[in-house]
Amino acid sequence: MVCFRLFPVPGSGLVLVCLVLGAVRSYALELNLTDSENATCLYAKWQMNFTVRYETTNKTYKTVTISDHGTVTYNGSICGDDQNGPKIAVQFGPGFSWIANFTKAASTYSIDSVSFSYNTGDNTTFPDAEDKGILTVDELLAIRIPLNDLFRCNSLSTLEKNDVVQHYWDVLVQAFVQNGTVSTNEFLCDKDKTSTVAPTIHTTVPSPTTTPTPKEKPEAGTYSVNNGNDTCLLATMGLQLNITQDKVASVININPNTTHSTGSCRSHTALLRLNSSTIKYLDFVFAVKNENRFYLKEVNISMYLVNGSVFSIANNNLSYWDAPLGSSYMCNKEQTVSVSGAFQINTFDLRVQPFNVTQGKYSTAQDCSADDDNFLVPIAVGAALAGVLILVLLAYFIGLKHHHAGYEQF
């Protein structure tokens, strides 16, 4: 748990409670902005993270997820007046900031726009960046909410522009708060109004050493990502999640019928994002290496468990599903992607092509059995050579024995 304490701005008060940061790089924020009379004028509670793609000095591309940058400040956050609407402004490191602007109409108020600024000159976050400086991405939202209603959106919302993907979830916000009291009337976003069936989850009973109870093979689903009118990423797979939290092991089969896919495709990276009523996001990030092969580089997950807690893990240093560009990777047998000690993904009937998809169809597949063959060939050759060596030695000793026997007879 990392706590940030904010101090009052002249003319307003601001309280930011502790940030609880899971293994995934995200910010959980709760904000209470007060006016000069110490009455609440704006309330917000939300989670967000940012994924940024940038070019390196060797002309390759990297993808990073923005993480904690130290002490958070709030310069520029205001309740609003007759000339300016309310604004939430958060700074979390030199050159890193996020702003949300609100406007008001006769009977509604709007989350008008958000902007995110990041500093590629920060060598810790953006190692080997080719271009250094502060870049800003602006997004117009115009989300209209009835006055004196609290806006809620637990579902994942994704904003993608240029090389930045912004993720928001568990959002609660009310601007133009009346009489200093946050409303109990909630206005839901469209995604929260649509109920979906949750995937089946099995959790074992806690014990000193718990292991997941074996489950049936998960159903394979087909997922795709489009770039305009063209399909740029294809994936077919059955997914089984193995999660360990607080010595409790869970096995979760992903139901493809209630799982939605989104993502993005770029020249050197591709993202497949899955979400459902319990999975905020399950990201598979692919990358190009040596300009002629692709592989699974990163997996990020954040999801609700049956006990109501949120499980979040990220690993951007993986190396799975390696295949030549222009082909697909296929593995019908069960495989395990080990994301961390607490999280593994079992895949079944896997086929994936994150780059160079043509006419919405898979290209020729490289089968995972080829990897096994590559491993077995040197073993087989070594065994054969060992066998030949043994035969030569046996022949030598037999010949030597007969030679000595001839001398004894003479």
From Swiss-Prot:
Glycan-linked positions: 32, 38, 49, 58, 75, 101, 123, 179, 195-196, 200, 203-204, 207, 209-211, 213, 229, 242, 257, 275, 300, 307, 317, 356
Biased composition (Low complexity): 199-213
Region of interest called Disordered, as start-end residue ranges on this chain: 199-221
Cellular component GO terms, alphabetical: autolysosome; autophagosome membrane; azurophil granule membrane; chaperone-mediated autophagy translocation complex; extracellular exosome; extracellular space; ficolin-1-rich granule membrane; intracellular membrane-bounded organelle
Region (Important for binding and subsequent lysosomal degradation of target proteins): 401-404
Similarity comment: Belongs to the LAMP family.
Segments on the Lumenal face: 29-375
Modifications made to the protein after synthesis: O- and N-glycosylated; some of the 16 N-linked glycans are polylactosaminoglycans.
Region of interest called First lumenal domain, as start-end residue ranges on this chain: 29-192
Associated clinical condition: Danon disease: DAND is a lysosomal glycogen storage disease characterized by the clinical triad of cardiomyopathy, vacuolar myopathy and intellectual disability. It is often associated with an accumulation of glycogen in muscle and lysosomes.
Entry keyword Signal: yes
Cytoplasmic side: 400-410
Region span, Second lumenal domain: 229-375
GO biological process: autophagosome maturation; cellular response to starvation; chaperone-mediated autophagy; lysosomal lumen acidification; lysosomal protein catabolic process; muscle cell cellular homeostasis; negative regulation of NLRP3 inflammasome complex assembly; negative regulation of protein-containing complex assembly
Intrachain S-S bonds: 41-79, 153-189, 232-265, 331-368
Localization: Lysosome membrane; Endosome membrane; Cell membrane; Cytoplasmic vesicle, Autophagosome membrane
Single GO molecular function: enzyme binding
PANTHER family cross-referenced by the UniProt entry: LYSOSOME-ASSOCIATED MEMBRANE GLYCOPROTEIN, LYSOSOME-ASSOCIATED MEMBRANE GLYCOPROTEIN 2
Annotated tissue distribution: Isoform LAMP-2A is highly expressed in placenta, lung and liver, less in kidney and pancreas, low in brain and skeletal muscle. Isoform LAMP-2B is detected in spleen, thymus, prostate, testis, small intestine, colon, skeletal muscle, brain, placenta, lung, kidney, ovary and pancreas and liver. Isoform LAMP-2C is detected in small intestine, colon, heart, brain, skeletal muscle, and at lower levels in kidney and placenta.
Role, per record: Lysosomal membrane glycoprotein which plays an important role in lysosome biogenesis, lysosomal pH regulation and autophagy. Acts as an important regulator of lysosomal lumen pH regulation by acting as a direct inhibitor of the proton channel TMEM175, facilitating lysosomal acidification for optimal hydrolase activity. Plays an important role in chaperone-mediated autophagy, a process that mediates lysosomal degradation of proteins in response to various stresses and as part of the normal turnover of proteins with a long biological half-live. (Microbial infection) Supports the FURIN-mediated cleavage of mumps virus fusion protein F by interacting with both FURIN and the unprocessed form but not the processed form of the viral protein F.
Quaternary structure and partners: Monomer. Homodimer. Homotrimer. Forms large homooligomers. Interacts (via its cytoplasmic region) with HSPA8; HSPA8 mediates recruitment of proteins with a KFERQ motif to the surface of the lysosome for chaperone-mediated autophagy. Interacts with HSP90 in the lysosome lumen; this enhances LAMP2 stability. Interacts with MLLT11. Interacts with ABCB9. Interacts with FURIN. Interacts with CT55; this interaction may be important for LAMP2 protein stability. Interacts with TMEM175; inhibiting the proton channel activity of TMEM175.
The protein's name: Lysosome-associated membrane glycoprotein 2
